[in-house]
């Protein structure tokens, strides 16, 4: 099957969303590219607007070549959307504030923004290596997790078995569009038997790959039965089972020990004290003069690097009319997350890390912690929402209403959860005042937005082929730095 046929089949089966998921899985890996070789910049002053990933990468690379760097951050913390929440932290959305009530334990934290790093995101991983950020494996795909209450192991085994059985029948009916020798036909049949765990007659009658109704011990055990073909008319099941085939979701996935904020903290620690100024929002930028207006005055620089999210950069009146219009057209996805602290009851069911799916529910996904196994308590990401209507619906609720709705939906997978879950905390990124959304995926970003305007350069994950990924922020930072002369 060629690429076009595969996309067409996905579109018929699951609509445009499925076709886009397949397209993402087939797309080439967008790497950060080579790190720019900057000229010596002693005596030159640079203002970096924003202390998220892109801003901190720019600041560190400029500091390394001798520039005098100041980072101006509107928020009271660094990191932007790289946000790790622990007990005592405060989340401030428009019109609501939440104090995180998790127990003060090093293993109890919630990555409310990015939570995973693909193994091929070598720009970001390079900084982890250089700066000594310890990493752990993140369990992204777990066969013991569930989709609509069905174990992913059972779904995957049934998918493979049914597809292999259908393909074997096609071979027997001579439906291949190219001649195949008898020897190759035997090899193809053997491959399909192995792929789908077929019997000698080419039939799928079940397999231990599906997991167990009764696990083996002294007795041999009873595998879960095959799922009927009609089950797979629902694309939610097979997409949940196969999402980790996408290049950005395949093992090995990684995460910093102790939370994603460890990376931005390491970048900030590598800068001279006083480089980063918090609580200092930018009101305007004058590109021709390198002037930046703040609530408390004005700053001048030889170079300004703006790493603000597009909706915030669009508010800067000194930028050109064309740029501001284009920035206003970059729509941010209103993704959201919610987490709770709970006893690790899921481990008693054999679930150690990974993601369960409720594709038709608002919460969409549940993420189980990938570390601290067998500890008394864990932080369960009870909702990860990226669909726009669901994200807007979630954001419109109060934190208490979000938690009640999420627990009710999650109880269809884990009935014990409402009785044991504590300390819910949620982040709706569209309501975070210094983000105004999670990523710009789906938006048409005009290429000229990544080009400098006067003395002002621009960076951010939304200006890369990897919006929503920290590697995209690194790539865009390197691109902006490469234009400095």
Feature locations, PLM:
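Conserved beta-strand->loop/alpha-helix structural units within folded catalytic cores of enzymes
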Residues: 45-75, 116-121, 127, 133, ...
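Mid-domain catalytic core of redox enzymes
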Residues: 280-383, 413
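Short glycine/proline-rich turn/loop motifs
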Residues: 38-40, 101-109, 241-252, 383-393, ...
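N-terminal twin-arginine translocation
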Residues: 1-5, 16-40
């Amino acid at each position: 099957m060629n690429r076009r046929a595969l996309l067409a089949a996905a579109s018929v089966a699951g609509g445009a969303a499925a076709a886009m998921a397949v397209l993402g899985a087939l797309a080439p890996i967008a790497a950060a590219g080579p790190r720019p070789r900057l000229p010596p910049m002693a005596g030159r002053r640079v203002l970096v607007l924003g202390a998220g990933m892109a801003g901190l990468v720019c600041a560190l690379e400029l500091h390394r070549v001798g520039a005098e760097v100041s980072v101006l951050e509107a928020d009271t913390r660094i990191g932007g959307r790289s946000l790790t929440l622990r007990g005592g932290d405060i989340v401030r959305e428009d019109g609501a504030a939440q104090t995180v009530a998790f127990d003060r334990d090093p293993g109890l934290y919630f990555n409310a923004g990015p939570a995973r790093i693909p193994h091929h995101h070598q720009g970001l991983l390079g900084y982890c290596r250089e700066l000594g950020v310890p990493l752990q494996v993140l369990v992204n795909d777990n066969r013991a997790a569930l989709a609509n209450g069905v174990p992913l192991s059972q779904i995957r085994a049934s998918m493979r078995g049914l597809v292999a059985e259908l393909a074997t029948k096609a071979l027997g009916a001579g439906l291949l569009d190219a001649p195949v020798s008898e020897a190759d036909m035997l090899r193809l049949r053997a491959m399909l038997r192995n792929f789908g765990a077929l019997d000698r007659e080419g039939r799928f009658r079940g397999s231990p790959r599906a997991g167990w109704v009764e696990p083996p011990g002294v007795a041999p055990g009873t595998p879960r039965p095959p799922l009927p073909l009609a089950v797979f008319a629902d694309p939610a099941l097979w997409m949940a089972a196969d999402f980790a085939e996408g290049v950005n979701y395949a093992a090995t996935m990684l995460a910093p020990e102790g939370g994603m904020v460890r990376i931005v903290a390491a970048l900030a620690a590598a800068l001279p004290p006083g480089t980063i100024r918090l609580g200092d929002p930018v009101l305007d930028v004058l590109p021709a003069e390198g002037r930046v207006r703040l609530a408390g005055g004005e700053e001048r620089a030889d170079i300004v690097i703006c790493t603000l999210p597009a909706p915030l950069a669009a508010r800067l009146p000194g930028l050109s009319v064309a740029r501001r219009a284009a920035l206003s057209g970059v729509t941010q996805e209103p993704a959201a997350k919610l987490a709770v602290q709970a006893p690790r009851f899921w481990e008693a069911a054999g679930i150690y890390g990974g993601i369960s799916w409720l594709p038709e529910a608002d919460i969409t996904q549940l993420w189980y912690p990938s570390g601290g196994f067998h500890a008394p308590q864990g932080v369960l990401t009870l909702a990860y929402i990226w669909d726009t209507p669901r994200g807007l619906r979630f954001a419109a609720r109060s934190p208490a209403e979000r938690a009640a709705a999420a627990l009710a939906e999650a109880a269809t997978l884990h009935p014990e959860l409402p009785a044991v879950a504590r300390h819910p905390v949620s982040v709706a990124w569209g309501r975070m005042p210094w983000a105004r959304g999670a990523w710009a995926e789906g938006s048409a970003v005009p290429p000229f937005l990544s080009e400098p305007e006067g003395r002002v350069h621009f960076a951010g994950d939304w200006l890369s082929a990897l919006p929503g990924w920290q590697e995209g922020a690194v790539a865009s930072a390197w691109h902006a730095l490469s234009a400095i002369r």
